[in-house]
């Protein structure tokens, strides 16, 4: 007998596994893939009261839906779970034991640095095929060429095409989880057939951001084609499955293509980045109420991240987006990590990053607070670049000696005080986002922002 499942609380998001047409008037019909929110448990534990995305409520059968979960923190997602990196020929043969025809893995070549080796178990022994890397393409036979390892594996999975056998079963590297399986299990996998890509709205070094249509709704889609880059973006997507707040850009789902493409689908923010929004409108259009509202929107998102132990690490007006109805939402979770983790900082935006984060790679909610102070300065200067007229190389030495930017023209003194509090050199002296929100609400209530 199966254990009785604990009832899902109100607010739980579910994804439909099948179509449900409904038989009674109180039923809520839905299609496979729809996202539904639980409103309440009914007397019968097999049925829930739920609402769909347009707010219509009704009764749904529990066994037709699955609960959406965050991808577990610490799960090592991989687009290539069969890729084992630098292992020797002998280690590969041990991993493919006991022999099973079609069991395979890919490793880095030990004899030919820069190339790879496909190791396949076949009729009791292991065959090793060199994958040559030439002119940015991969090939085993120098006849068929592939853009990346995923395309190569997909090809030989459907057809042996000269190998001893077609690839049947990947030998998954210990500790990794196939990304597609995990997004599917946790209810975040979307169907490529239902996504229409309409036009490019942004270009990044990783690929394009496109306006799309998913089941009749406008969406933004990050299209990542390169397998190494896609691997890095998996971390961003899995962080986004754990976060839900009205001032964070909402993940709608992920599509992992067998050929190696990764599509991250989010809500569409019609008015673009906050920095462009501010620059294109300026003082004549945007009054004090509007600037303070944007400041509070961002602060509430950051208070939520603070409360859930996430550090954003790249907070700036360019990474805040504005919706059709003028709500500011924090986006770009590429560097967001659980608070305890450290990482190599690579190319950090010097003018937005706290001194201790630049110096010792110490990231915390308090370094996010420093960046929030810079973002407030951007808002009240209508999108100017911080530290105007100071050469980039001089910014850090001056800041470490205690230099703080002047208030932007026309900035209310009370708001400038909040900025300066964010720029304490001693991180412990900076306010929390909870305190910052309270300070901004005090300014709003007492109309100190006008």
From Swiss-Prot:
Gene, per the UniProt record:
CSK
List the source organism.
Homo sapiens (Human)
On the tree of life, the source organism's domain of life is Eukaryota
Tell me which cofactor or cofactors this protein depends on: Mg(2+); Mn(2+)
The reported effect of residue 304 to F is: Decreases activity by two-thirds and alters conformation
The name of this protein is Tyrosine-protein kinase CSK
Which class of enzymes does this protein belong to? transferase
Presence of the UniProt keyword Metal-binding in the record: yes
Please give the residue positions where the record annotates the modification Phosphotyrosine.
184, 304, 416
In what residue span(s) does the Protein kinase domain sit?
A: 195-449
Q: Where is this region: Interaction with PTPN22?
A: 9-70
Q: How does it assemble?
A: Homodimer (via SH3-domain). Interacts with PTPN22. Interacts with phosphorylated SIT1, PAG1, LIME1 and TGFB1I1; these interactions serve to recruit CSK to the membrane where it can phosphorylate and inhibit Src-family kinases. Interacts with SRCIN1. Interacts with RHOH. Interacts (via SH2 domain) with SCIMP; this interaction is dependent on phosphorylation of SCIMP 'Tyr-107'. Interacts (via SH2 domain) with PRAG1 (when phosphorylated at 'Tyr-391'); this interaction prevents translocation of CSK from the cytoplasm to the membrane leading to increased activity of CSK. Interacts with LRRK1.
Q: Where in the cell is it found?
A: Cytoplasm; Cell membrane
Residues in domain SH2? 82-171
